[in-house]
Every structure is written in C-alpha cells, then in structure tokens.
C-alpha cells in the first residue's frame, strides 16, 4: 500500500510512472513536430500525414487513459501549492484543448483529402503546437509533483 493515498502499489504504479508519462509526452511532442513539418510539404504528402495523424491520435488516447487518474490525484495533493483560480484555469485550458483536439481529429481522420490539404496545414499549425505546449507544461508542473507526493514512482526509462 502506498501510504500517501492508500493506493495498492500494483494498480496505478504498474500503469503509470514518471518515466512512462514523460516518455509519452516526449513521443507526442516529437510526433506533433513531425506532423507539422509534413503538413508544410506538397499535397502529395497527405497520405503520409493521414497515417501520422492516426498514430498520434492513438498515442494521445492511450496516454490520456493512463494520465487521467494521475492528474486528478496530483491536483488534489498539490492543492495547497496553487491558488484555486490557478487550478481552475489549468483545468479549463486542458478541457478546451481536449475539446479542440477531438474536433481536429474528427475533421481530419480517417483521410486528409487533397482539396483540404491547405486547410489541414493551417489547422495543424494551430493545434499541434498547443498539444506540445500542454505536455511540456504538464512535465514541469504536474509529474514532478506526482512523484513528490508519492502518486507515481520514477519507473524505468521508456524508449520510443
């Protein structure tokens, strides 16, 4: 049992660790940068972009499934470290990003059509940096706190 939150060691600890979550974030940020770069290529790259976006959507969905519990528990544990307004603002920003991400995925999957390629490039240039910024912010503010409060362990290095 993990004393801080009376969590069984085998539950969250097996699914989430600092190394896993940071590794996911690094992978998501790299995939975002690569997809933005492809979106600037000629329309003939749209098939490659569709595949990359589909893979990114799967990685993000898998990550969110693991992260959700960590975020909730860490927010409670760190409540004394931040004002209520700061916590509300961070949650609102995350909720808006999730909503916008779902709309982006719905718009551009399963296939990016040739006549929408220019718009995809503009949409990708707007959405993907936001996603990268969010994972960077979570790395700084959230995961170190999750380790500090015993919500997640350090885990082993994850190579993607």
Locate each region found by the language model.
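Small-residue-biased structural context
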Residues: 1-160
